[in-house]
């Protein structure tokens, strides 16, 4: 596969931002072995925004011939008070429920879970020279910048935090360089850490990204954050700035179960959640159900998506692109309930292999049900 085809695969949905395409092309051209990574806190049930969005992108990267890695961020989860801040519980969940759930998610999105390397953060954090990299990065970033970056943990600027949380952004950047990562992958909410990585790349003395004597910058790949199903706190949305802010605030959240569909939800749970979803008639700009359709159902276009309706309501209708679907919805030709029902049935079918896996192997999910879920 030539470089341009690889770049097209990397850019396809659900990619929302690539920092930068020019640098990605340069990395391919210099011939450095390409290593992807995406890091996850271990914090609760896996929802579609985690499993399917990351799984879809991992599938694309594999098709482009890139080695893929999932970094199970146990220490980072401990710092950020996940699962009650109990490191032993976090590690147990990471290596059972989370690992198996991500494998199944990758599989349903067309990737090969056996080609994904899973690394527990403890395995590298316990090496002394990792902390040299953390200090090296920290010496090249101001305290004010680190404090602004705590939003990568789902924390607000100005929120009262313990000191450990200020180390977190430097650790996240160190993870990239210590593992020799060329493509750092995350949701759009992790952008601040990745921008720091790009900016400090050529200043580092310990574990820089280097190939044949040249210090290189990693590429940052950010996928779309699926909107949560709940109604936003402010409606209607007046300004573009408000809209951008809301998109990040209203992402799917495991701490708000009705905002999210989890990868192992039952068919009835999926139907109930979609029925309750915020989906105002004719609204296409901020509509979680249309958002899910665009990034899950219409990830590959053209694709056939049929909405079944009684003849008296217009009968069945088939769409091949998300734009066709949005157009009919905006014009009032498609009722919100018909859209919700069709998306629910699509997800039920898509997630069937995941449900079947956890029915045959219930132990990881049972363990997860026993532990405290935090945001």
Curated annotation (Swiss-Prot):
GO-annotated cellular components: cytoplasm
Enzyme class: ligase
Binding site for L-tyrosine: 37, 168, 172, 175, 190
InterPro entries tied to this protein: aa-tRNA-synth_Ic, Rossmann-like_a/b/a_fold, Tyr-tRNA-ligase_4, Tyr-tRNA-ligase_arc/euk-type, Tyr-tRNA_synthase
Keywords for this protein: Aminoacyl-tRNA synthetase, ATP-binding, Cytoplasm, Ligase, Nucleotide-binding, Protein biosynthesis
Annotated compartments: Cytoplasm
Keyword field contains Lipoprotein: no
Domain of life: Archaea
Motif 'KMSKS' region: where in chain: 251-255
SUPFAM superfamilies with a match to the protein in the record: Nucleotidylyl transferase (SSF52374)
Residue numbers binding ATP: 254
UniProt-recorded Gene Ontology molecular function terms: ATP binding; tyrosine-tRNA ligase activity
GO biological process: tyrosyl-tRNA aminoacylation
EC number per UniProt: 6.1.1.1
Pfam name, any one: tRNA-synt_1b
Task of the protein: Catalyzes the attachment of tyrosine to tRNA(Tyr) in a two-step reaction: tyrosine is first activated by ATP to form Tyr-AMP and then transferred to the acceptor end of tRNA(Tyr).
Family, as annotated: Belongs to the class-I aminoacyl-tRNA synthetase family. TyrS type 4 subfamily.
Descriptive protein name: Tyrosine--tRNA ligase
Gene responsible for this protein: tyrS
């Amino acid at each position: 596969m030539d470089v341009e085809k690889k770049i097209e695969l990397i850019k396809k949905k659900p990619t929302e931002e690539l920092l930068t395409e020019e640098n990605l092309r340069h990395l391919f051209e210099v011939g450095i072995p390409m290593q992807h990574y995406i890091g996850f806190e271990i914090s609760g049930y896996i929802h579609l925004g985690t499993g399917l969005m990351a799984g879809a992108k991992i599938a694309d990267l594999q098709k482009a011939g890139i080695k893929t890695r999932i970094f199970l961020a146990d220490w980072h989860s401990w710092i950020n008070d996940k699962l009650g801040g109990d490191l032993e519980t976090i590690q147990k969940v990471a290596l059972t429920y989370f690992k198996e759930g991500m494998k199944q998610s990758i599989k349903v999105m067309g990737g090969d879970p056996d080609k994904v390397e899973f690394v527990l953060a403890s395995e590298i954090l316990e090496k002394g020279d990792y902390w040299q990299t953390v200090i090296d990065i920290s010496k090249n970033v101001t305290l004010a910048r680190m404090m602004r970056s705590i939003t990568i943990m789902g924390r607000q600027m100005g929120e009262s935090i313990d000191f450990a949380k200020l180390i977190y952004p430097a650790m996240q950047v160190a993870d990239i360089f210590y593992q020799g990562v060329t493509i750092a992958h995350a949701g759009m909410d992790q952008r601040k850490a990745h921008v720091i990585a790009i900016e400090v790349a050529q200043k580092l003395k310990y574990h820089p990204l280097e190939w044949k004597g040249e210090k290189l910058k990693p590429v940052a790949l950010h996928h779309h954050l699926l909107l949560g199903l709940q109604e936003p706190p402010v409606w209607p949305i007046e300004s573009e700035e408000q809209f951008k802010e809301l998109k990040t605030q209203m992402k799917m959240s495991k701490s708000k179960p009705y905002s999210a569909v989890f990868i192992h939800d039952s068919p009835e749970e999926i139907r109930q959640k979609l029925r309750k979803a915020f989906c105002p008639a004719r609204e296409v700009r901020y509509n979680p159900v249309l958002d899910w359709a665009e990034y899950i159902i219409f990830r590959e276009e053209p694709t056939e998506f049929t909405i079944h309706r009684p003849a008296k309501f217009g009968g069945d209708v088939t769409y091949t692109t998300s734009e066709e679907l949005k157009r009919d919805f905006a014009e009032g030709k498609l009722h919100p309930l018909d859209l919700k029902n069709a998306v629910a049935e699509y997800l039920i079918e898509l997630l069937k292999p995941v449900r079947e896996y956890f029915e045959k192997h219930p132990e990881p999910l049972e363990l997860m049900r026993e532990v405290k879920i935090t945001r």
